[in-house]
Amino acid sequence: MEKFLFYLFLIGIAVRAQICPKRCVCQILSPNLATLCAKKGLLFVPPNIDRRTVELRLADNFVTNIKRKDFANMTSLVDLTLSRNTISFITPHAFADLRNLRALHLNSNRLTKITNDMFSGLSNLHHLILNNNQLTLISSTAFDDVFALEELDLSYNNLETIPWDAVEKMVSLHTLSLDHNMIDNIPKGTFSHLHKMTRLDVTSNKLQKLPPDPLFQRAQVLATSGIISPSTFALSFGGNPLHCNCELLWLRRLSREDDLETCASPALLTGRYFWSIPEEEFLCEPPLITRHTHEMRVLEGQRATLRCKARGDPEPAIHWISPEGKLISNATRSLVYDNGTLDILITTVKDTGAFTCIASNPAGEATQTMDLHIIKLPHLLNSTNNIHEPDPGSSDISTSTKSGSNASSSNGDTKMSQDKIVVAEASSSTALLKFNFQRNIPGIRMFQIQYNGTYDDTLVYRMIPPTSKTFLVNNLASGTMYDLCVLAIYDDGITSLTATRVVGCIQFTTEQDYVRCHFMQSQFLGGTMIIIIGGIIVASVLVFIIILMIRYKVCNNNGQHKVTKVSNVYSQTNGAQMQGCSVTLPQSMSKQAMGHEENAQCCKVASDSAIQSSETCSSQDSSTTTSALPPTWTSSAPVSQKQKRKTGTKPSAEPQSEAVTNVESQNTNRNNSTALQLASCPPDSVTEGPTSQRAHTKPNALLTNVDQNVQETQRLESI
């Protein structure tokens, strides 16, 4: 028996060891079971946690989300700690089975919003800790199931508001921490029923005022001992931009000397300690109406806008009183805006009278009267005006175009109502309307057209005669949907008042306007064409300049190798001067020839070189060879020699002979190299001129010239 109990004990221990998650510590303190998994590096909630766990600690891990199955069937769980994780998402109804949960710690995570069903099923939750998250939004019904809360901590978040209606129902709440948020308003009466509340912390928000509440009258601090009485309500509101006027006078009258709250406005009290300012300096400025409409006259059926602006401290609220003495509120025919503007969408004769604008704040009120005159439309005589047509009521466009069958005629046929008005033509800015309805309404004065756009709810009214069958609506926006209604303004035969009746409504959309796009495209194309044409012209000029430069460079290069033109060649066969006769030679040869012309004593060498050239090139074409050389040298030597003989004095015979011999020896070597160069060149390298052409036809004359050159050379040697 003892062995059996021992084995049973071992089996129980083994089962317990298997149920406890890895890395966690399970404490069995009968009848409670605690599972401690803090600081274990967990990425998710362990799936094998004992469902009978009473206390579960999962703090300081890396859990990112909570799923529905993580805490399923844990009905005994009382305390759940999920602090200091990275939780950013909680599945709806994730805590639905935790009906006995008393404390839920979700502080220091990454939650950004609280949805409707996140805390569903937590009807016994007393402590909800959500501080140090990134909350920006709390759903209006998120706290509906946690009405038994005693402590709610939402501090250190980014909340601008919270569901105050849900807070108002938490009658068991005793601690509310809202510090370090961006809350700018607390509705009046929020804490009226929270009699158990002992601490409210709204430090470091954007509150300019606190609403007076009977709960705050318990906010007292014992000046002598500094101990808070159990019945005392602790209020912390430091770090807010308080506007110290008469609205905070109730708070100043509390005995609080230990806090250091300061005023942010008005300018006279900026930076001063709240509790040190005398009560008589908490002042308010009574309202003063600064701008208003003096008098207005409008045609019956048109729109009337009355304006009233006031200033004061605090900002005054503006109300309107009708000529009958009734408070005007938002209705189908009238709108009251927050800035003090009153809009009467469709005026009637009974709207004539004095409208009163009332601006009020805690310091007082101011009034201003404005006269509205409705110009009555002329009545048309009609024998059937005793027939009573029922007034369908309001004629504002929101009722006639947005409410389905209400926009139809009195028989309720919407399709027939739309068929009564047809858009014949619609462009980007205009629409042509055609009226197909029968004018059987007695006493019709005129028709009123009213329309607005999808993006602009401002009504536009047009009045047209009752005989009109078409109407052109101008100044419309392109690509915009319009709701348009036609109303008949007629005389009520029984009441003798002007009544309106919806004849028909239609919805249409204007065309898209592409004119500006095409215009911009045409401008773009025109500019592009100008740029292209200009580019072509510039490119053409550049190409022309480049061509000229290339041609000039080529001509320059050719000029360096250009053949020398030798003119005025005299024939030695007949002694006559040949006009226009020339022989072309390479530049090197022309330079040598010119040098020989300058020096008369070189004629002999030139003749020898010409003879040598003719002998070495005898294998080439005889016409080319003979045309290249002889005439050039025959023209220079005799002429220059004759000039020397005339101008120069005749020296002795021996020096002259030695000089000629030296010159002959020097020029012979030079011209021999020239002759060899000419002989080694191909025949095509020598350009044929007119003289060479004549040389082909007269070979005997050339031979005669050569013989004469030889004779002349011998004569010079003998001298």
Swiss-Prot record:
Residues 551-719 are cytoplasmic. Residues 414-503 form the Fibronectin type-III domain. This is Leucine-rich repeat and fibronectin type-III domain-containing protein 5. Disulfide bonds join C308-C357. Residues 1-17 form the signal peptide. Residues 287-373 form the Ig-like domain. It comes from Rattus norvegicus. LRR repeats lie at residues 52-73, 76-97, 100-121, 124-145, 148-169, 172-193, 196-217. Residues 18-51 form the LRRNT domain. Residues 383-416, 614-719 are annotated as: Disordered. Glycosylated. GO terms for biological process: negative regulation of inflammatory response; negative regulation of macrophage activation; regulation of presynapse assembly; synaptic membrane adhesion. Belongs to the LRFN family. InterPro entries: FN3_sf (IPR036116), Ig-like_dom (IPR007110), Ig-like_dom_sf (IPR036179), Ig-like_fold (IPR013783), Ig_I-set (IPR013098), Ig_sub (IPR003599), Ig_sub2 (IPR003598), Leu-rich_rpt (IPR001611). Keywords: Disulfide bond, Glycoprotein, Immunoglobulin domain, Leucine-rich repeat, Membrane, Repeat, Signal, Transmembrane, Transmembrane helix. It is a single-pass type I membrane protein. Pfam families: I-set, LRR_8. GO terms for cellular component: cell surface; GABA-ergic synapse; glutamatergic synapse; postsynaptic density membrane.
